[in-house]
Amino acid sequence: MYFSYIGYFFLPPLVAVPAAAPPVCQPKSATNGHHPVPRLSISSRATVVARMEGASQGGLQTVMKWKTVVAIFVVVVVYLVTGGLVFRALEQPFESSQKNTIALEKAEFLRDHICVSPQELETLIQHALDADNAGVSPVGNSSNSSSHWDLGSAFFFAGTVITTIGYGNIAPSTEGGKIFCILYAIFGIPLFGFLLAGIGDQLGTIFGKSIARVEKVFRKKQVSQTKIRVISTILFILAGCIVFVTIPAVIFKYIEGWTALESIYFVVVTLTTVGFGDFVAGGNAGINYREWYKPLVWFWILVGLAYFAAVLSMIGDWLRVLSKKTKEEVGEIKAHAAEWKANVTAEFRETRRRLSVEIHDKLQRAATIRSMERRRLGLDQRAHSLDMLSPEKRSVFAALDTGRFKASSQESINNRPNNLRLKGPEQLTKHGQGASEDNIINKFGSTSKLTKRKNKDLKKTLPEDVQKIYKTFRNYSLDEEKKEDETEKMCNSDNSSTAMLTECIQQQAEMENGMVPTDTKDQGLENNSLLEDRN
């Protein structure tokens, strides 16, 4: 039974799609000058696959990958297990009840007929089963019943062999019959496959004409191609169901005396080549069938198999097309996603680099402005403090300068040398008192060089209040240099945050508005207090 499915799907001679479609499947009137639309038919060149894949494919089929085969195998196994569980749940209770019923019937028969032993009863039942397996009904008078091997019945049995249906209600019992059945099936099944192919081609022609008319009508109404294909498929299946399923089911219900469910069950099981054999047309020994009844049933099986083969082939083609289109769409989506990711990554890197450069430049400018403002404010404060000293006190500071020196390039303003010396009280003029405040402050601002060049003897002879003022200026200069170094390090680091930029800008704004930092104000107040005490 499974061989029929293999033939329908994998062997070209056995599939109902063998030859070129007749030209009537694509009439010129149906095209209206446009490209022909994919049509549902049984012919191989009129199938959906041939039209949707295009002539570039050349009819070549790709080999299925092992991963796909394993995945399908797993799905089939799961499907089989599910079906087995459902059938067991539905049929096992009935089987158990039948076992109990036959056991009770046998016990009751032996109780009513004491003269019959259990062994004799079992022998009688076994003979009845053998007769039934041989095709002889043990019910009623078997001598008056029709033979299972008359010409009509034998013809019907031969048809079930080459169609691979195999109902199983009758089977050859002799060795000669079994050997002939093997040879008959080997040569008959391929021959029947060719016949199915020819009938399928003719059915494709008939349905192709009908579907072309339907497509022409819908194309005039400007219906989309997808809707046309869906409607054509539905009409194709409905027409086949009416001709090959509904009408035969009604006939079998009337002749065989079956219910509607049993009739439809027999039709579907037969046309799918399953053939359980529990229901067989012409197999009721109590009905006198006409001689032409069984040959007519076999002819219906022939045409119905061709139709069902076309339906199954069409479903398989649609699945292949959908699978291929899905793979192509997934590939396109992956390509677009990769391209989009690359573009976004490049844009992100460029934006990050640009922002990093801008932030770094702003931080550098802010740090430079802050350093210059601090230096300017510190110089102003020192100059103001020195101006408050008397000429005698300033002469003492002038004595500390034993040699000429200048500020470092880092601390000097505009890299100018500081060559100005403080003069004594007798040499101090009005011009000397107010001249070059910047050079004076730069000398005292360079604490490192001042420490190296200062005269230790003069330092020891300085008064205590002057030493306090000197230490205050020195500590203040050291603190200022440390703050400037820390600010430059923070501004030059790669991981500087925008918070530092905000702080620098705020401090710059405060300095531009004339606000003096708190530490500078405190230091100035302390210097003023020391000077007042000294005076």
UniProtKB/Swiss-Prot annotation:
Detected in dorsal root ganglia (DRG) neurons (at protein level). Pfam families: Ion_trans_2. It catalyses: K(+)(in) = K(+)(out); Rb(+)(in) = Rb(+)(out); Cs(+)(in) = Cs(+)(out). K(+) 4 binds at T164, T273. One of its GO terms (biological process) is cellular response to arachidonate. Activated by stimuli such as mechanical stretch, acidic pH and polyunsaturated free fatty acids. Activated by a dihydroacridine analog, ML67-33. Inhibited by polycationic dye ruthenium red. Selectively activated by T2A3 (2-[(4-chloro-3-methylphenyl)amino] benzoic acid). It is found in: Cell membrane. Residues 151-177, 260-291 dip into the membrane without crossing it. It is a multi-pass membrane protein. Residues 164-169 are annotated as: Selectivity filter 1. It comes from the Eukaryota. InterPro entries: 2pore_dom_K_chnl, 2pore_dom_K_chnl_TREK, K_chnl_dom. Disruption phenotype: Double KCNK2 and KCNK10 knockout mice suffer from chronic cutaneous allodynia which can be partially reversed by treatment with topiramate, a drug used to treat chronic migrane. One of its GO terms (molecular function) is outward rectifier potassium channel activity. The chain crosses the membrane at residues 69-89, 179-199, 231-251, 296-316. Changing N288E: No effect on extracellular pH sensing. Causes reduced inhibition induced by a pH shift from 7.2 to 8. Inverts pH-dependent gating, with channel conductance being inhibited by acidic pH and activated by basic pH. Changing R290L: Loss of K(+) channel activity. Normal basal conductance but reduced inhibition induced by a pH shift from 7.2 to 8. Inverts pH-dependent gating, with channel conductance being inhibited by acidic pH and activated by basic pH. Residues 525-535 have a biased composition (Polar residues). Residues 1-68, 200-230, 317-535 are cytoplasmic. Residues 273-278 are annotated as: Selectivity filter 2. K(+) 1 binds at T164, I165, T273, V274. K(+) 2 binds at I165, G166, V274, G275. Homodimer; disulfide-linked. Forms heterodimers with other 2-pore domain K(+) channel subunits, such as KCNK2, KCNK4 and KCNK18. Each subunit contributes two pore-forming domains 1 and 2 which assemble to form a single pore with M2 and M4 transmembrane helices lining the central cavity and M1 and M3 facing the lipid bilayer. The transmembrane helices are bridged by the selectivity filters 1 and 2 carrying a signature sequence TxTTxGYGD that coordinate the permeant ions. Up to four ions can simultaneously occupy the selectivity filter and at least two elementary charges must translocate across the filter to convert it into the open conformation. This is Potassium channel subfamily K member 10. The lineage of its organism: Eukaryota, Metazoa, Chordata, Craniata, Vertebrata. The gene is Kcnk10.
